[in-house]
UniProtKB/Swiss-Prot annotation:
Organism annotation: Arabidopsis thaliana
The protein's name in its UniProt record: Putative auxin response factor 15
Gene, per the UniProt record: ARF15
Annotation: DNA-binding region: 126-228
Domain topic, free-text comment: Interactions between auxin response factors (ARFs) and Aux/IAA proteins occur through their C-terminal dimerization domains III and IV.
Domain PB1, residue spans: 511-592
Length: 593
């Protein structure tokens, strides 16, 4: 590691949010803060919720909420203006936070505004979730080919071994040196010398995210975002100075009474307690009631945005100290399981209404992109397809389940009834409008059938002379649930199978297998990952396919790698099994050198 500044040919552009920092610093800070970070604008009118600030202090100091909150005459929300924003990073953990200066809204003070028309240079960036091999003792970081081409300085490919030195600055202003080379079999982009020092100094672990940003002038920035389980607290020095010296309530009360500025610390992963005035009004006007369906955004492990669905089951005050407060006033119930803890009470501005046509959510963990028939319910696949025009759908109009009927599936028929959101993983379909040319085509077909009696006409495999009877999937589900209820009354044991299991049984034979190539073997093999439960079974299956008998388990002679859509090589076993199944395109077995 080196400390210093990179010399640019042009003066560094100041940030738009934090003018004391550079534009590149600001872009890196936002990427490290995550996709859900919502920083207000300079001069913007906002609502400040003391309850949210106290909640952040509670999480940081592990104090009880009630012990921190005295009883005083302070509104549940304060209307303020944003005076200044300073984007910061914690020295030890590299966690991002912001110091936001607020002032109770007044027209007597000149408020600085954010320059939205400022020139914004082109910035390329990429993020990657670190695997076990990325932080291993060999000190090598594999850069996906697409990201290396777009975000790293170009290599001189005319050289026998293309390589270059990279200088990257982190959020602290420290400069790091990495050796970037293009080598291996097959060749790939690697960061070698300097990478091990970086991972050791930053105490990186598997699951952390590395962030690279490159500006138009070639300046390179590097940052990290800790995995969710690695998230620590705001440093005690910051909390004690900015929040705890006079107390959150005391400082807010003093500013409110005397119309003076006060500073709050905002952490990107905390709930938003500084809310835009317009955003707050939109949320309140949405009229969230008991029974309303909603969706809420969360951050995935790879810095991606994920949505989860739920239902509002109650409206009440989160704390007895503030009556009629909107902070976490909605009690919710989630539809699906998540690998992390989600709140059971949320604020109106954190969620979005689900439109009636979207009341049947697509499961966030349902990754299958190929839609399949579910004949278990006695319906054609057209009932379960999303609102996309399919072949043959223009001929006539199919009967589909209305959103009103589908929404009834969320009510449990009996105590032991399954959650129908899991029973029927389908998409709501709006009826296709009838068109004039549909009637003309059907009339033409009917005339042909009349003139040529005895001939069985088929259109897309469907007999036009004797149209099939299409059963309503909703009625069939109701019948199955009724049978289940009756069976339990008489002590019988009946089980409704979920469509996921039905699909896997019906279509396992048609799934695309993954090709496996072994060094020294001309003809490759194919393995079906859908029937395997993990890496141990995969290794056993590969040993059977190539008659290796235990040689792959020790990995002394062979190594197993795979390539994804970007053709980059990665070791098998570094990623969680479900992620591996989604990424893998081809598997290779190579001899160790």
């Amino acid at each position: 590691m080196e400390t210093g500044n990179v010399v640019n040919a042009q003066p560094e552009l100041s940030g738009i949010i934090d003018r004391s920092k550079s534009y590149m610093y600001e872009q890196l800070w936002k990427l490290c803060a995550g996709p859900l970070c919502d920083i207000p604008k300079l001069g913007e009118k906002v609502y400040y919720f003391p309850q949210g600030n106290i909640e952040l202090v509670e999480a940081s100091t592990r104090e009880e909420l009630n012990e921190l909150q005295p009883i005083c005459d302070l509104p549940s929300k304060l209307q303020c203006r944003v005076i200044a924003i300073h984007l910061k990073v914690e020295n030890n953990s590299d966690e991002t936070y912001a110091k936001i200066t607020l002032m109770p809204d007044t027209t007597q003070v000149v408020i600085p505004t954010q320059n939205e028309n400022q020139f914004r240079p082109l910035v390329n960036s990429f993020t990657k979730v670190l695997t076990a091999s990325d932080i291993s003792a060999n000190g090598v970081f594999s850069v996906p080919k697409k990201h290396a081409i777009e975000c790293l300085p170009p290599l001189d490919m005319s050289q026998p071994l293309p390589a270059q030195e990279l200088l990257a600055i982190d959020l602290h202003g420290n400069q790091w040196s990495f050796r970037h080379s293009y080598r291996g079999t097959p060749q790939r982009h690697l960061l070698t010398t300097g990478w091990n020092e970086f991972t050791t100094s930053k105490k990186l672990v598997k699951g952390d995210v590395i962030v690279f940003v490159r500006g138009e002038t070639g300046e390179l920035r590097v940052g990290i975002r800790r995995a969710r389980h690695q998230q620590g607290n705001i440093p005690s020095s910051i909390v004690s100075i900015d929040c705890m010296r006079h107390g959150v309530i005391a400082s807010a009360k003093h500013a409110f009474d005397n119309q003076c500025m006060f500073i709050v610390v905002y952490k990107p992963r905390s709930s938003q307690f500084i809310v835009s005035y317009d955003k707050f009004l939109d949320a309140v006007n949405n009229k969230f009631n008991v029974g309303s369906r909603f969706t809420m955004r969360f951050e995935g492990d790879d810095l991606s945005e994920r949505r989860y669905f739920g239902t509002i089951i109650g409206v009440s005050n989160f704390s007895p100290h503030w009556k009629c407060s909107d902070w976490r006033s909605l009690e919710v119930q989630w539809d699906e399981f998540a690998s992390f803890l989600r709140p059971n009470k949320v604020s109106p501005w954190e969620i979005e209404h689900l439109m009636p046509a979207l009341n049947v959510p697509r499961s966030s963990f349902l990754k299958n992109k190929r839609l399949r028939e579910v004949n278990e319910f006695g319906s054609s696949s057209s009932h379960l397809l999303p609102p996309i025009l399919t072949q043959g759908q223009e001929i006539g109009q199919l009967s589909v389940a209305s959103p009103m009927n589908i929404s009834l599936l969320y009510r449990e028929t009996t105590e032991d009834a399954m959650n129908p959101s899991r029973l029927l993983m389908s998409y709501p379909v709006q009826p296709m409008p009838k068109r004039n040319y549909n009637n003309q085509m059907v009339t033409q077909i009917e005339e042909n059938i009349t003139t040529k009696a005895g001939t069985n006409f088929r259109l897309f495999g469907v007999s036009l002379a004797t149209p099939p009877v299409i059963k309503d999937p909703i009625e069939q589900i109701g019948s199955d649930i009724s049978k289940l209820t009756e069976g339990k009354k008489f002590g019988q044991s009946q089980t409704l199978r979920s469509p996921t299991k039905i699909q896997s049984k019906q279509f396992s034979s048609t799934r695309t297998c993954t090709k496996v190539q072994m060094q020294g073997v001309t003809i490759g093999r194919a393995v079906d990952l859908s029937v395997l439960n993990g890496y141990d079974q995969l290794i056993l299956e590969l040993e059977k396919l190539f008659d290796l008998k235990g040689q792959l388990q020790t990995r002394n002679q062979w190594k197993i790698i795979f390539t994804g859509s970007d053709e980059d090589e990665m070791l098998v076993g570094d990623d969680p099994w479900p992620e591996f199944c989604n990424m893998v395109k081809r598997i290779y077995i190579q001899k160790r050198r």
